[in-house]
């Protein structure tokens, strides 16, 4: 019976959405606190693990204070997102509309932030959406960013519709 949780944990841990950690670009204090950590905005970068040549930057609020310093504060759902083509686009595998590109816990137990991807077939544009959800209910707060797939060097750019499942 103890084997089932271990197997589930192994499956979750090997997911491409969890395989990489974002790179911290910088943090900026927004609320000064004298004896505890300040509230901050933190900007991170992450490469799409399934599509080479695409990177996303996102900014999240990080709570300070005693609860934030101990990692117990529930973070708010405000997240901004910007994704860009940073090199030649190369698809590593087929994907489905709405596949999770990145997932991160935003509270001790229940809240998580997710970046999902899709393909606008008509315009050959990758579409990224970031949102937060909870065990019971999610937040309507979200941000969307698009990446038109452009030629990089010589040759035609790939068509994202050819890589949809």
Sequence positions of predicted segments:
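Mature extracytoplasmic domains of secretory-pathway proteins
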Residues: 55-121
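Sec-dependent signal peptide recognition
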Residues: 1-7
């Amino acid at each position: 019976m103890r084997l089932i949780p271990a197997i589930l944990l192994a499956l979750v841990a090997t997911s491409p959405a969890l395989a990489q950690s974002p790179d911290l670009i910088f943090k900026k204090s927004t609320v000064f606190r004298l004896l505890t950590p300040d509230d901050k905005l933190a900007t991170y970068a992450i490469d799409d693990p399934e599509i080479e040549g695409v990177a996303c930057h996102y900014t999240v609020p990080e709570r300070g204070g005693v609860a934030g310093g101990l990692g117990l504060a529930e973070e708010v759902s405000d997240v901004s997102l910007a994704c860009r083509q940073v090199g030649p686009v190369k698809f590593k595998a087929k994907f489905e509309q709405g596949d999770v590109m990145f997932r991160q816990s935003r509270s001790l137990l229940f809240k998580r932030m997710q970046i999902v991807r899709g393909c606008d077939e008509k315009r050959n544009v990758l579409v990224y959406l970031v949102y937060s959800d909870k065990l019971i209910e999610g937040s309507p707060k979200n941000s969307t960013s698009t990446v038109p797939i452009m030629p990089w060097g010589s040759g035609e750019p790939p068509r994202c519709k050819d890589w949809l499942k």
